[in-house]
């Protein structure tokens, strides 16, 4: 009986791999699942696990052993760096908490057992088998967008990509046009590292001058002077919400263009 269930698990696994690889027509997914008595409309999470600094074949086994129910949870090897986990969810379908916890466990397991670093992209929950491929693509986008805008994060959910996702979908020509319109007076390159650091800290502290000067260990007047200097250079007063938004988006657009040109 164990052999039979293992065999069935392998058949299901092949089916799932065909779905996420787009090797099966959407209409056939339901028919094939019905033949196999494979549940089509249970909520499933799709996690893409990408090994970053080095790769190890043992990662596949390590993750597979974490999810022993081979008829419900599937760990697939996509290429030498990428593994995918399709995990049936038990909690509410719209709760990201369960999926985040799974991702954290995987990251810890790979780090503790194999000394591997990874990034994990999470798609939105698949409520039907036929949308698995879309959710897998979302997990891929989460990693790609995260690589540009959230470099310090190792677990990235598609739901939390925010403006980054929007920028990522823009043609580079449009991005370049936007930058030249925003920085009419001087190009963004005119701002030195210290100035950019000040700006980022100011954004992190919600445009609060007192709080930012405290975090930067500078006098309030020094920060005000720096903000005035930025205003002179760019024409944007970062103390004004609308100007701050334009500047924040411009910084993200610049980051995106750098990544497209291979400059991280």
Task: Please place each PLM-identified region on the residue numbering.
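Cytosolic nucleotide-utilizing catalytic cores of signal-transduction proteins
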Residues: 22-264
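Single conserved hydrophobic/aromatic residue that forms the stacking wall/gate
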Residues: 1-12
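Short amphipathic coiled-coil heptad-repeat segments
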Residues: 13-19
